[in-house]
Amino acid sequence: MMKVGLQVLSRTMKSHLEGVPDSLGNMRNQLGMTFFRAYASPEAEYNQGGWHIRFQMPITFTPYYYNDKLMGAKENASKTQVAPQLSVSYFLTARLQATLSGGIAQREVDEQNFYQGLLMRDYRNLYMGFVDYTADKSKHVSFNINYKRPLATIFANAYIRKSWSDSHLTVARDFVGDYIINSYFSNSSSSENLMAGGKVSKGLGFMHGLVSVGFDYLRFDGFLRQNDSPSAYSSDNYMLSAKWSGRPVDWFNFTYELNWDKDKMVLKNLGFDSSSTNLAQNLTFNFQPLKSWFIKLHGEHYRNQIADHQHKNLTLADASTSYGFRNGMELSLTALNLFNQRTYGYTVYSGLTRTSKEYQLRGRTILMSIFFHF
């Protein structure tokens, strides 16, 4: 079997950054990029005796046409890329399946970075692109195992994936006054990525419900240059999730969800490390005392790190009820933010950037509605 196709993209960008010092760099962009990507993906499969083997060989050919009107630069280039992939699955038993897969690839040219003027994405971070058609290389291998026992409503899976990337560009960050200039420079570097995790779920027949627990881990090791100082860096992310739902009686059901995550970032040569821990919980009760009467109670709890060794707890609660009359009229009453919380804060990671934010919340709100159904 073979898949073939053609993808066409044409884009233009015009920007003018104001309000920052001209000494930081070029403030304007006016450019265009067009490419035509032809691809073919031959495939072969084998299914017999519990084995499922699949081989793919995607091939792409892409001519690029780049025009930077401000710089007076026109560049044409073409790339041919091949990305073989192999997946082997085997049913160890009727309920247990294992899959081993791997592949080698050349990443597509990131034409989104083809610009040379500065762009601002938030109040502090400036970004400078880099025009280069060299393709980065990567390879990966993964192992998955799945267990299913439908009659007992037991399901489980686990996975581990390792990937390696070789890049011809290295990320650079320079702190200039109140700003951070993010850019690239031509320098070969490598990075590694490890992902592992699993999930187990079990049906609860006696209460018509389900309970599940999952865990995921992500580690990244890479290289960057910060203020002209090269540094290896790593990031770790741990995520734990749990869910419990049920309907013990016909007129009542509930759902509880918990999500916990911890992020850690280390710049090894610069002696810098930082971490953040966050917790979120949700609990919902639904009641139906009568056929036409519904009651819903919902609560949320957040424990978010807003600075080192500082956390902020936030509890929110909503309640609503509705009643439908025989003549088609429905009366609804909703109370939002019962505890009248006013602020919400948290810390997020994006690549090598850590940002703490705080928002103002709408206070307690009472809503009454009348609906007519015809």
Describe the function of each predicted region.
Residues 1-374:
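Exposed, low-structure sequence patches enriched in small/polar residues
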